């Protein structure tokens, strides 16, 4: 498998995670272990699963981790929508 850092999708998901960390710094303190934590974990999981998949030996294993990454992306999207609607 190739180096995950060479993948455009990994770079974009890494940037997304960094932005989520920046944005959630402004979330209320009482959300530190709630929405803030869940959103950060989902966002960082996207790039992490792409990286882990690149370390696997077979294409089906890699595809499985991309699928998990997609699930994390959907989860992060929901938490962004929730944060928006709670304002």
Residue ranges with predicted function:
Residues 1-87:
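Amphipathic alpha-helical assembly/interaction segments
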